[in-house]
Amino acid sequence: MAGKSGEEKMKEMEAEMALFEQEVLGAPVAPSPVDPVPLSIQAVPIIRPVIATNTYSQVQQSLQARAAAAASVVGPNFVSPVTFVGPAIPPPRPPVMRPSFIPHALQRPIEPHGAMTRPSFIPHVLQHRAPGPRHPGMPPLQPLMAHHMHGPPPPLMRHIPPPPLGMRPGPPPAPMGPLPPPPRPMVQSAPKINPTVIQAAPTVYTAPPVRKPEEEIVEPPIIPEEKESLSYEETVIGPSMPEIEPVQPEVVLEPVQEDKKKAKPEKLKRCIRTAAGTSWEDQSLLEWEPDDFRIFCGDLGNEVNDDILARAFSRYPSFLRAKVIRDKRTGKTKGYGFVSFKDPNDYVRATREMNGKYVGSRPIKLRKSQWKDRNIDVVRKKQREKKKLGLR
């Protein structure tokens, strides 16, 4: 019984492989009314160890090669029908273009028969490999392709009905009418897109760079400019060189004399003051105009500053400036300041009207400023006059 069971298992395996090959190649499989022989599931673990790690990759390669061959053979047979290129074509494209490996046992619908649910399956690639360990009662293996190449399959494989169209891999629906046209639109669309891109590239990138350098080269006329420059140089070199040399020193000498003249009055603007037998230079007097009319403002409070003093005398039209004298170290006021006017009439009016008026918290006291009496020139002149009069 052990030997018979092994032979039956091998026949079942060969029948399943033959059916799978026929489905892949697209050959019709006639269902047989014979009921399948139920087999025990215990035979599965004996066959599974034969599958190796590279079984999936080998099966994928064989399926892709056969799918490509089937597509190339089926293509020219359906040249005449043009009606199938309509909108009904796109749905079947994915199964036709990408055949994927799915075991035959998983593709078939589940039925109440026990033979339909068994997971025993060996891919076609395992037939080419070296024979694995066998039982002593098993016969030698034979290529499974002989069943469908040389004659009809054995009677044991006819009891398996073909799977539905939805569960089959890519190649089986090749004989169907609407499936062969899909490769055509893809082949026709590709050449249409490529030439358009190739033709657009040269027109966009080649035309502008060729025109720009030509325009740039043509525009600048270099030859006439060189001739003109040479002609100007020839005309200028002769008579112009001796004429320019004598003119330059004359122009340079004039500003030197002006600078000397300007330097003299700057030296005379020094304000030297003398008092109590000492003399010093007061630079603060240079801020005032020498020809103005100044008023001495005394008895000023600590809160009075330049702005308050200027606001008190700004109603006069010829008012120039007002300043409060402060201690350089502490910054406090010394209690007096000066106000200058350009018009002597305003000077007289301000002295009469503002004398004794409150500026800040105290009444202001005004009198004529005697800042010129402390100048060294004025002091020396007075000393000479006194000597002439014999006072000293």
UniProtKB/Swiss-Prot annotation:
It comes from Xenopus laevis (African clawed frog). This is RNA-binding protein 42. InterPro entries: Nucleotide-bd_a/b_plait_sf, RBD_domain_sf, RBM42_RBP45_47-like, RBM42_RRM, RRM_dom. Coiled coil: none annotated. Keywords: Cytoplasm, Nucleus, RNA-binding. Belongs to the RRM RBM42 family. The gene is rbm42. Gene3D superfamilies: 3.30.70.330. It holds the Pfam family RRM_1. May bind RNA. GO terms for cellular component: cytoplasm; nucleus. Residues 293-371 form the RRM domain.
